[in-house]
């Protein structure tokens, strides 16, 4: 699941996961500087941390593989295969799993290519370059369609998320320069989606 919006609202804990008490308060614990969910019954502090989204930018010759979303948010729009990292997974394992689940594609992972922070919704995208092993791919349950696109064919106006547009713009620019590098940036509510070489991110 590519989840730019899913899980965006980080809400208060209603019941303490440690003791089950409903007496959970939003306070700054002693020795801390941020408001946390703290159980008034047992004293347990419940930390809420950013979610990690992992995925791939699958390549085949001069084309990239995109999936058209079958689920909300942004149903019917195009994205790279990506979703939430699961517990006990490495970044690489999660990226391979998401690519197989969403695109039915087997890939060989290359280098980590994009790290994009989305602080307003407490998410971090981590996307790898990847090489398709063959041209066998197809939509999984979360995709309507899976296709290879040349740069001139990318449906820029129909991309689901700014993270994906940023990553693809950087990728095609790097390809023209014949110099791929790790892109580390952030996207806020008003951040443009131009390549991070050209715009502050």
List where the protein language model places each region:
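Conserved Nudix-box catalytic region and its N-terminal flanking loop in Nudix hydrolases
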Residues: 3-6, 59-101
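Active-site donor-binding loop signature of nucleotide-sugar glycosyltransferases
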Residues: 41, 69, 82, 130, ...
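Unchanged
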Residues: 85-170, 174-180, 192-201
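Conserved hydrophobic/aromatic beta-strand scaffold that supports enzyme active sites
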Residues: 15, 36, 57, 66, ...
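Acidic, metal-coordinating catalytic segment for phosphate/diphosphate chemistry
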Residues: 8-55
């Amino acid at each position: 699941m590519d989840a730019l919006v899913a899980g965006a609202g980080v809400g208060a804990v209603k019941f303490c996961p440690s003791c089950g008490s409903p007496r959970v308060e939003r306070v700054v614990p002693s020795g801390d500087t941020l408001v946390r969910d703290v159980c008034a019954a047992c004293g347990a502090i419940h930390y809420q941390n950013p979610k990690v989204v992992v995925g791939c930018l699958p390549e085949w010759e001069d084309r990239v593989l995109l999936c058209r979303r079958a689920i909300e948010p942004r149903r019917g729009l195009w994205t790279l295969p990506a979703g939430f990292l699961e517990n006990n997974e490495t970044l690489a394992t999660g990226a391979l799993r998401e690519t197989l689940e969403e695109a039915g594609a087997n890939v060989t992972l290359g280098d980590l290519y994009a790290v994009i922070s989305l602080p307003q919704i407490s998410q971090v995208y981590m996307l790898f370059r990847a090489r398709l092993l063959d041209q066998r791919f197809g939509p999984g349950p979360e995709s309507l369609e899976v296709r290879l696109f040349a740069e001139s064919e990318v449906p820029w106006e129909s991309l689901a998320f700014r993270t994906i547009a940023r990553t693809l713009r950087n990728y095609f620019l790097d390809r023209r320069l014949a110099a791929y590098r790790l892109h580390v940036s952030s996207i806020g509510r008003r951040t443009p989606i131009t390549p991070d070489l050209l715009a502050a991110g």
